[in-house]
Amino acid sequence: MSKFPTVSEILSGKIVVGEKVTVRGWVRTRRDSKAGLSFLTVYDGSCFEPIQVIINNDLANYQTEILRLTAGCSVIVTGNIVESPASGQAVELQALEVEVVGWVDDPDTYPMAAKRHSIEYLREVAHLRPRTNLIGAVARVRHCLAQAIHRFFNGQGFYWVATPLITASDTEGAGEMFRVSTLDLENLPRTEHGKIDYSQDFFGKEAFLTVSGQLNGESYACALSKVYTFGPTFRAENSNTTRHLAEFWMVEPEFAFATLADNAKLAEDMLKYVFKAVLEERKDDMQFFAKHIDKEVITRLENFIAAPFAQVDYSDAIEILLKSGKKFEFPVAWGVDLSSEHERFLAEEHFKSPVVVKNYPKDIKAFYMRLNDDGKTVAAMDVLAPGIGEIIGGSQREERLAVLDSRMIEMGLNPEDYWWYRDLRKYGTVPHAGFGLGFERLIVYVTGLQNIREVIPFPRAPRNANF
């Protein structure tokens, strides 16, 4: 065992009673008793609970330092592990020596003083908010989910591929992209027609931050068979909502020789795997979310794991919604995309389980989705989860060059701009499929938090790029 065990290792019983250890962390609270003892709670971020430290008043620095400790001070405590007489923790630390490493300059103005803070306030001090119970728990759950995703895909024989963050292609064809440029905004070069001359820019052409790693991922799937990307993506969508970020992380598997049915199975297996992992590996944090954020959060994940996914064609889903007798805020009609209220009705009230809606009208989906034989729909799917609605979107990709070209032209895109993507269809084309999972949306679902800005360390949104 390390000379400096974590609080998690101590509280989980990996250190035996009587052993001398050194703990390094930060003070959460200090309480003094009339009997000449002080009690500190010290956390190091390794788990939800802090460890209680008992300090006798005969320590050399008791009067000069211990009695001045406040929330946020950093300490190194050496002492013996003893059984705790109080309920709550099996063991505590009897201090032999306490070294104060860092003081809080002015405890009265310390932004993280030991009291309950609103979530809105914590966003204003995002550099300090990981010190709170809430954001500390979110950070550990985020880590657990990320590790589980990598483990899942590795176990399924997928290779992780790093796709570029700077791109010249718009995967979604929506045009909501951040431009990357080194041109002088005060003195933009112009063509003879008065347009900005991007040939003089860093890349010699227009460049953007990526909205998805999918197209690049497809090129590797058509060589390695099974790949996935997991990295940041960017959308310049002027949406200041609880569900949108300008910078977020995406998980995007792509696999060759795969159909839409294979895609739906992969999505189901992955979600159940990662939910099982977080319930087993982060029990302490999940209990906190169930107690303070959303009492249904653990039950919801357990039900998700236990339930087989329902599947329904988009056309049938529209019929279900029309016949439901329910008044929706947004109208229901074939050819219209499902809104969040429609998705949640299907998952929560009709199927009462996760549901895969598939075969959407081609006019509301992207150019790369495989055209079905009816000529009206594409082999697209959305996974809808009770409690949130859409959590995954994916499709079988269009592997036929002529069909892909006509879809691009139909949608006002220039096939030549995607010459390299078209090459994949020219040289040994193969049916393939994939999906995208917004990682932060997954964390929102797991934690029960209402706002996506709480589940990423430093949220980026319209008019907000602090820190």
Swiss-Prot record:
Keywords from the UniProt entry: Aminoacyl-tRNA synthetase, ATP-binding, Cytoplasm, Ligase, Nucleotide-binding, Protein biosynthesis
Main location: cytoplasm
UniProt xrefs under InterPro entries: Aa-tRNA-synt_II, aa-tRNA-synth_II, aa-tRNA-synth_II/BPL/LPL, Asn-tRNA-ligase, Asp/Asn-tRNA-synth_IIb, NA-bd_OB-fold, NA-bd_OB_tRNA
GO biological process, one term: asparaginyl-tRNA aminoacylation
Subcellular locations according to the entry: Cytoplasm
Reactions mediated catalytically: tRNA(Asn) + L-asparagine + ATP = L-asparaginyl-tRNA(Asn) + AMP + diphosphate + H(+)
Entry EC number(s): 6.1.1.22
Keyword ATP-binding listed: yes
Oligomeric and partner information: Homodimer.
UniProt-recorded name of the protein: Asparagine--tRNA ligase
Organism: Haemophilus ducreyi (strain 35000HP / ATCC 700724)
UniProt lineage: Bacteria, Pseudomonadati, Pseudomonadota, Gammaproteobacteria, Pasteurellales
